[in-house]
Amino acid sequence: SYAPGLKCIALENIPEFASIARIAFEKAAHNPIDLRTGNYKELLPRALEDMGKVDFVFFNTIYEQQNNVWLFNECTKHIHNDTIFVFEGIKTSRKMREFWKEVCAHPEVTVTVDLYSMGIVFFNRKLHKLSDYIVYF
């Protein structure tokens, strides 16, 4: 096991994708992954309650544009100093670029890294927010 005691919850709202994910998790995961299928607005509050504080959250924001602000706000209620968020598809549309700007401006966010196809967000108070980092390939 890579991380003994690791607790991982994955949420998927499309049953067909959940079936594929379940197979992949069973083959590759060294720790059991709690895969929950259904509406994010119903699943997320309970998942966050079960987790307490979150260490890492991956947002598949391309397909959930209508829920991005809500998902982000709910998850930020459960951060700690070492929490990291990763957002997929931050440049895929004007709406996503605007959402990414909102994330970068959030008062709890200390550092952001823009990798064009995804964005990484840190909440660590030891990191000083001098600017947002943009990486060009």
Question: Which sequence ranges carry the predicted segments?
Answer:
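S-adenosylmethionine/decaboxylated-SAM
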Residues: 1-137
